[in-house]
From Swiss-Prot:
Part of the 50S ribosomal subunit. This is Large ribosomal subunit protein uL15. InterPro entries: Ribosomal_uL15, Ribosomal_uL15/eL18, Ribosomal_uL15/eL18_sf, Ribosomal_uL15_bac-type, Ribosomal_uL15_CS. Binds to the 23S rRNA. It comes from Porphyromonas gingivalis (strain ATCC 33277 / DSM 20709 / CIP 103683 / JCM 12257 / NCTC 11834 / 2561). Keywords: Ribonucleoprotein, Ribosomal protein, RNA-binding, rRNA-binding. GO terms for biological process: translation. One of its GO terms (molecular function) is structural constituent of ribosome. One of its GO terms (cellular component) is cytosolic large ribosomal subunit. Pfam families: Ribosomal_L27A.
């Protein structure tokens, strides 16, 4: 057996419907489109969202919400990540540049430190925002917090 001798299983491949090729083919005449009406014509396509004259769902449902232009998006970083980063690179001070170098955040993202995990070493952590519990945990471990 080799690749050039492989064939699909018997009955696995069907020949396609050749429509509109005369009455002898069995698929001539209306060519599977039925008689008359917009759907039988060439170039037919119904509008996206058209429901046959019924009020479409996008008009039945009310508008709601808005996008707040003053929203500030923070990239969350957990204490467990800071701990592993400090152990791997033997750091006592962790800045946003260190997080960028480690590939954890992009250059123009704002960083918020969250309290998932524990910190055992005294770390000086620089970030744009801290959760209360994360700030308390860093200070309890003998470290300090610098808000940018």
């Amino acid at each position: 057996m080799n690749l050039s001798s492989l064939k699909p299983a018997e009955g696995a491949v069907k020949s396609r419907k050749r429509i509109g090729r005369g009455p002898g083919s069995g698929l001539g005449g209306t060519s599977t489109r039925g008689h008359k009406g917009a759907k039988s014509r060439s170039g037919y396509s119904k509008k996206i969202g058209f429901e046959g004259g019924q009020m479409p769902i996008q008009r039945r449902l009310p508008k709601f919400g808005f996008k707040n232009i003053n929203r500030v998006e923070y990239k969350p970083i957990n204490l467990s990540v800071l701990q592993t980063l400090s152990e791997a690179n033997s750091l006592s001070k962790i800045s946003v540049e260190d997080l960028i170098a480690a590939g954890l955040v992009s250059r123009n993202s704002l960083v918020k430190i969250l309290a998932n995990g524990t910190v055992t070493t005294a770390l000086t952590v620089e970030a744009h925002a801290f959760s209360k519990t994360a700030e308390e945990a860093i200070v309890r471990a003998g470290g300090s917090v610098v808000k940018l």
